[in-house]
Curated annotation (Swiss-Prot):
Binding-site positions, NAD(+): 37-41, 86-87, 117, 140, 175, 289, 313
Cofactor: Mg(2+); Mn(2+)
The protein's name in its UniProt record: DNA ligase
Active-site residues (renumbered): 119 (n6-amp-lysine intermediate)
Keywords associated with the record: DNA damage, DNA repair, DNA replication, Ligase, Magnesium, Manganese, Metal-binding, NAD, Zinc
Domain BRCT positions: 640-715
Pfam families, A to Z: BRCT, DNA_ligase_aden, DNA_ligase_OB, DNA_ligase_ZBD, HHH_2
Gene Ontology MF, one: metal ion binding
EC number of the protein: 6.5.1.2
Catalytic activity: NAD(+) + (deoxyribonucleotide)n-3'-hydroxyl + 5'-phospho-(deoxyribonucleotide)m = (deoxyribonucleotide)n+m + AMP + beta-nicotinamide D-nucleotide
Its job: DNA ligase that catalyzes the formation of phosphodiester linkages between 5'-phosphoryl and 3'-hydroxyl groups in double-stranded DNA using NAD as a coenzyme and as the energy source for the reaction. It is essential for DNA replication and repair of damaged DNA.
Family according to the record: Belongs to the NAD-dependent DNA ligase family. LigA subfamily.
Length: 715
């Protein structure tokens, strides 16, 4: 009898969940409710009553499970099942036609079907459903790893907690955003100095709020548009995916359309651009996807984005404001940058007060003067940029920039190569250059030292150790201490700051006592101190742990961190994929560097110059003494030395189903293959993907070099 009663209660709960889920979809997604708010609220309360009485029957996808007031997020990093790649850009019809021509080479037809989608200006999200139940939600992160925000995602009522599918595991991607109407209402209710800069930042910040109950109040929404492995799951076209997402109850942008050719699509695309301000959500362009999945693998990918889709960037909105001043800054490489300080102006949903002026030549060519009224756009919808001057409004007090060709920080003479437009400070002791380099070194993409923000680094960089010691000793002398304490000994070097170089970062722990001052008398206010670093013992220990963790970063990060001209993360990865120990770079020639994949002669010369300088090797040796990792460990158990590919030289050309960097890394580790950039008699194999360079293929044939056209990295 009890079993029957329990079965009946279970069925009642399931029926209530089914009803409420249907009504939520009608109200939040379709904007067409079939029941009144009163009916919904009463049913919700009824379900809540049953769930409290019979918690063993609570369903994970019940509407009551969207918000748990006691939940807090930890934002654990999780690897994506499929890379979250960015998209290539185009800006006009001609570039769109070029995109179509590349597709046509594969499809063998002039007219190709495309899906046009609005490019939502929000935060990318990847949902994972297991047996139809929402189980995980990840942000884009770096495209390889994202942060889990599942608790916060569940608060968005347009996202179904359960979908009707027999697929065991499915990944569904979309964009979290806030409507224009809701964003304006939210900002209207806030004080002037607490208003959100733009809707995208608001959505991003909300989704990363640790308080789930607070997120539930944020009025977030989401659109969905993509299943990364749709073809494997039996879908044949992108438009079929869109229709299925609608059927499953996902919010899908009404503006998504299917076209039989690129010219038809372009007409509708321009209509979308002209009407973008009439939408109740912000878009920064449109996405064009080739509709037929069967050709995707053949069309392939670059190292950064798929070649079967492209983002069309709309012409930027132009506004006018007054240029109040021109600020000169020195970057980590010594490059001088020119920044316009502006009268605040709203542009594309953001309040703009600064914009780039590129370089001195740009300023002179446009005759930009302080106090001028200038035209402003967002370059690629992100970076504010001054594009011209309203000469009709030029005021009498407009004045040209006084440029004395000296560094604004150290006042040493600037230099410029005849073939370049940028001016550089080459003085090694330039304070601003040193600080910018330290900020770069500690940044997330490089050595990823959490706790050393720009402001904290600036404080450590500018504060003399002896000044802090004197303040501490004064506190001890005045008996503002909780224990008997000897005076701290002054350093011999009066000019020594806490962090003057990257080496000092790894020795910060020795200053713990004078930084956090745990010996201060209880109740003493640190706010009265002249030198207050705002660290408690726990936060300082966390910083030291992060510094120690940075010692074990991958080799490519260290290579990028060495501040070598023209060397960014992509080039550093290319080097580390071939040479797994920094010491191997000591005796390389320019030609050796040029043989590496994707490295130009300019970059090769820069690398050769850096690693030929004994001063730089002194720094590397000092880093080694501090236990900084300078090599990638190779697991010899995974190396296949019996393969015909072992220890051979390869040239890679064309596009592949995964990025070229990933291929190079896998093959370098598995077979110790060395990748070079050009085909010569010294090359053993050419690995060719889709649309390989004809010249390289022809050279390989002439030299009888075997051409591989299979995925040997998966063997």
């Amino acid at each position: 009898m009890i079993e029957k009663k329990n079965e009946s209660i279970k069925e009642i709960i399931e029926d209530l969940v089914k009803k409420l889920t249907k009504w939520e979809h009608e109200y939040y997604v379709l904007s067409n409710p079939s029941v009144s708010d009163e009916v919904y609220d009463n049913t919700y309360r009824t379900l809540l009553g049953y769930e409290r009485k019979y918690p063993q029957y609570v369903l994970s996808y019940s509407p009551t499970q969207r918000v748990g007031s006691s939940i807090s997020n930890k934002f654990i990093k999780v690897k994506h099942d499929y890379l979250m790649l960015s998209l290539g850009n185009c800006f006009n019809f001609e570039e769109l036609l070029n995109f179509n021509e590349n597709i046509a080479k594969i499809s063998k037809q002039e007219d190709n079907p495309y899906v046009l989608e609005p490019k939502i200006d929000g935060l990318s999200i990847s949902l994972i459903y297991l047996d139809g139940v929402l189980s995980e939600a990840l942000t884009r992160g770096d495209g390889v790893f994202g942060e889990s925000v599942i608790a916060n995602i569940k608060t968005i009522k347009t996202i179904p907690l359960k979908i009707n599918t027999t697929i065991k595991k499915i990944v569904i991607r979309g964009e979290v955003y806030v409507s224009n109407q809701d964003f304006e209402a939210i900002n209207a209710s806030r004080d002037e100095d607490k208003k959100f800069a733009n809707s995208r930042n608001y959505a991003s910040g909300s989704l990363r709020n640790i308080d789930v109950s607070e997120v539930a109040k944020r009025k977030l929404n989401a659109f969905f548009y993509y299943i990364p492995n749709a073809y494997e799951l039996g879908f044949e076209t992108q438009y079929q995916v869109i229709q299925q997402l609608k059927e499953w109850g996902f919010n899908v942008a009404k503006e998504i359309k299917l076209f039989s050719n690129i010219k038809e699509l372009y007409t509708s695309l321009k209509e979308l651009e002209n009407n973008k301000n009439k939408l109740d959500y912000r878009i920064d362009g449109a996405v064009i996807k080739y509709n037929n999945f069967k050709d995707y693998e053949i069309i392939g990918y670059t190292s950064k984005f798929p070649k079967w889709a492209i983002a069309y960037k709309f012409a930027p909105t132009q506004v006018q404001t007054q240029l109040k001043d021109i600020i000169l800054n020195v970057g980590r490489t010594g490059k001088l940058t020119f920044v316009a300080q502006l009268a605040p102006i709203e542009l594309e949903g953001s309040i703009i007060t600064y914009a780039t002026l590129h370089n001195l030549e740009y300023i002179n060519d446009l005759d930009i003067r302080i106090n001028d009224y200038v035209y402003l756009i967002k370059a690629a919808e992100i970076i504010p940029k001054v594009i011209g001057v309203n000469l009709d409004k030029r005021p009498n007090n407009a004045k040209k920039l006084e440029f004395d060709y000296n560094c604004p920080s150290c006042h040493q003479p600037l230099v410029k190569k005849p073939e370049e437009v940028d001016w550089y400070c080459i003085y090694d002791q330039c304070k601003q250059k040193q600080l910018q380099y330290l900020i770069y070194y500690c940044s997330k993409p490089i050595m990823n030292i959490e706790g050393l923000s720009e402001s904290t680094l600036a404080l450590f960089f500018n504060t003399k150790v002896n000044d802090v010691i004197r303040e501490c000793n004064e506190l001890i002398t005045n008996q503002n201490v909780s224990e008997d304490l000897s005076l701290f000994k002054l350093l011999d070097n009066e000019e020594q700051t806490f962090v003057n170089s990257v080496l000092d970062i790894y020795q910060l722990e020795r200053y713990k006592e004078i930084i956090i001052k745990p010996w201060l008398k209880k109740g003493f206010s640190k706010s009265s101190l002249k030198y207050n670093f705002r660290f408690q013992e726990k936060s300082f220990d966390k910083l030291i742990n992060s510094i120690n963790e940075s010692k074990n970063r991958e080799l490519y990060r260290l290579l990028a961190a060495l501040n070598i001209k023209y060397i960014g993360i992509a080039t550093a990865k290319s080097i580390a994929n071939t040479y797994h120990d920094i010491d191997q770079l000591k005796n390389l020639t320019v030609e050796d560097y040029m043989r590496l994949a994707d490295i130009s002669s300019i970059t090769a010369n820069s690398l050769f110059s850096f690693f030929s300088d004994e001063k730089n090797w002194e720094l590397i040796e000092q880093l080694k003494t501090l236990s900084i990792n300078t090599k990638d460990e190779i697991n010899n158990d995974l190396v296949d030395s019996s393969s015909i590919y072992y220890d051979k030289k390869f040239v890679i050309t064309g596009s592949f189903s995964i990025s070229r960097n990933d291929i190079i890394k896998k093959l370098s580790l598995k077979y110790k293959i060395k990748f070079v950039s050009g085909v010569s008699k010294n090359v053993d194999f050419v690995l060719a993907g889709n649309s390989p360079t004809a010249k390289k293929i022809n050279q390989a044939k002439v030299l009888n070099i075997p051409i591989i056209q299979e995925e040997i990295w998966n063997k």
